[in-house]
Amino acid sequence: HIFMMRDEEMTYNPENETVGENILMKRIPIKNGQEHIEAVEEAVQKIARALRRTRSKIARRVYRDAFPDGHQEIMLVYPFSSWSEFEGGVRGLPEGFQDRYEKIYGKGSFRKEVMDVLSAHSDGVTHEIMTMVK
């Protein structure tokens, strides 16, 4: 069983919206070791800062293990309304987000500070879709 708690510092929820009918969950199992946890947390935090600075309309909630047993995991939860939102780009994040991130942090920073960090410090990222059935 996994018990996750919302991390308000890394969460971006501009209009305090509630979980919608469709959500994308990105699960990031972090490699063991404090340096891995810190690196992934910093990458996730920088994305939150960029979402705030660009006043994104898309919410992103961040959850972490409430009772880590030596293995930490972070879950990113994004609402979506249409399957077309998954065409191209970085799933979950707003269209054009990578370019806006690099305007804030510098050219090539998204790959270096997000993609390369997740590759080096996590055991990959899985994507799960949950949709409400009426």
Residue ranges and their predicted role:
Residues H1-K134:
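Short S/T/G/P-rich N-terminal loop/turn motif that feeds into the first structured element of a domain
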